[in-house]
From Swiss-Prot:
Keywords: c-di-GMP, DNA-binding, Hydrolase, Magnesium, Manganese, Metal-binding, Transcription, Transcription regulation
Species this chain originates from: Escherichia coli (strain K12)
Effect noted on mutating F206S: Increases catalytic activity
Gene label: pdeL
Enzyme Commission number(s) from the entry: 3.1.4.52
Gene3D superfamilies, alphabetized: EAL domain, Winged helix-like DNA-binding domain superfamily/Winged helix DNA-binding domain
Cofactor: Mg(2+); Mn(2+)
Reaction(s) the record says it catalyses: 3',3'-c-di-GMP + H2O = 5'-phosphoguanylyl(3'->5')guanosine + H(+)
Function of the molecule: Acts both as an enzyme and as a c-di-GMP sensor to couple transcriptional activity to the c-di-GMP status of the cell. Phosphodiesterase (PDE) that catalyzes the hydrolysis of cyclic-di-GMP (c-di-GMP) to 5'-pGpG. Also acts as a transcription factor to control its own expression.
Name of the protein this chain belongs to: Cyclic di-GMP phosphodiesterase PdeL
Record-annotated HTH luxR-type domain positions: 18-83
Gene Ontology terms for molecular function: cyclic-guanylate-specific phosphodiesterase activity; metal ion binding; protein homodimerization activity; transcription cis-regulatory region binding
Induction of expression: Autoregulated. Directly regulates its own expression in a c-di-GMP-dependent manner.
Miscellaneous field: An overexpressed EAL domain (residues 77-362) has similar KM, Vmax, pH and metal dependence and subunit composition as the full-length protein.
Length: 362
């Protein structure tokens, strides 16, 4: 019987579940299974997919019948017994330490973040980015993970908002940039030319004294003729559109430092950025990428984003690519770069070097 690979990241546990599903399971059904495994209810899925709860319930019933799942109560048991999933932690190990999201607020405080910064517990985890046409490694996005000595990996959505509101994000980003340079420095000769290194930047970081110097330090250490630093701007903590901010943009651009609009299409700020600042990349939000093959409206949104980016000559990255169908669709729509769990989750720096840089350079 034909089969298809299926991967889903369960953020609550910090693990990726890998299943081999029957080949008869469609792209739409795999998306539904992913949302169910991530804990979404029928009501939540109906809102997410812009479909009625009755329609989602019917699709869920058909999916359960196809996969031999008896009920919600036996959902996980039936999956584990029938499909023998491979469960891999983000570090690649088989040992896990779990913590319930409800308990994070007892751990994540400004004092705890400050102490963790002193102890260098925040580490860069790196996700590769590939050329859509050739499949060649062309860059990466650097993300931050809190490697807590007692509780294990704490996901960024649990500490980034507090780090931003407390101002500690400036020190965190500075550490992240330095660690990234240290990780890539020994293998910079193996990096392809114009290797893109994306780092998320909040308003606090962008406007902080010395930020431009930190960017130039990273670029100069790895080689301005070798790498291209891409500062990724988000909706969450937008940079104010002021003459002062524009002057910083222009100064960084003169040093060959580029800018990307992250999670594009999800809010007003990214469109305001596009109007006000000289950006170079648009990163299509994963919600549109993952829905484009099963939802006509999402597909049209992707088409509009691609057309919007094409006129000023911006490069386009599709984030959150999880299936080959999604990758093929994005390539067909004219996207330039692909990033997502189909290729690799974010991994620790040493694993990124061994799994991707050494292989690409060899």
């Amino acid at each position: 019987m034909n089969s298809c690979d299926f991967r889903v990241f369960l953020q609550e546990f910090g693990t990726t579940v890998h299943l081999s599903l029957p080949g008869s399971v469609s792209e739409k059904e795999r998306l539904l299974l992913k949302l169910l495994m991530q804990g979404m209810s029928v009501t939540e899925i109906s809102q997410y997919r812009n479909r009625s709860a009755k329609t989602i319930s019917h699709q869920k019933k058909q999916l359960f019948e196809k996969l031999g799942i008896q009920s919600d109560i036996t959902f996980w048991r039936d999956i584990f017994f029938q499909y023998n999933p491979e469960i891999i932690s983000a570090t690649g190990s088989n040992s896990h330490r779990y913590i319930n999201d409800n308990h994070y607020h007892h751990i994540v405080t400004p004092e705890a973040i400050s102490l963790a910064l002193e102890n260098h517990e925040f580490k860069p985890w790196i996700q590769p980015v590939f050329c859509a046409q050739t499949g060649v490694l062309t860059g990466c996005e650097v993300l931050v993970r809190w490697e807590h000595p007692q509780t294990g990996i704490i996901p960024p959505d649990q500490f980034i908002p507090l780090a931003e509101s407390s101002g500690l994000i400036v020190i965190m980003t500075r550490q992240l940039m330095k660690q990234t340079a240290d990780i890539l420095m020994p293998v910079k000769h193996l990096l392809p030319d114009n290797f893109h290194i994306g780092i998320n930047v909040s308003a606090g970081c962008f406007l902080a004294a010395g930020f431009e110097k930190e960017c130039l330090n990273l670029v100069n250490k790895l080689g301005n003729d070798k790498i291209k630093l891409v500062l990724e701007l988000t909706e969450r903590n937008p940079i104010p559109v002021t003459p002062e901010a524009r002057a910083i943009f222009d100064s960084l651009h003169q040093h060959n430092i580029t800018f990307a609009l992250d999670d594009f299409g999800t809010g007003y700020a990214t469109y305001r950025y596009l109007q006000a600042f000289p950006v170079d990349f648009i990163k299509i939000d994963k919600s549109f990428v993952q829905m484009a093959s099963v939802d006509e409206i999402s597909g049209h949104i992707v088409d509009n984003i691609v057309e919007l980016a094409r006129k000023p000559g911006l490069s386009i990255v599709a984030e959150g690519v999880e299936t080959q169908e999604q990758a093929d669709l994005m390539i067909g729509k004219g996207v330039h770069f692909l990033q997502g769990y189909l290729y690799s989750p974010p991994v620790p720096g040493n694993k990124f070097i061994s799994e991707w840089v050494m292989k690409a350079g060899g």
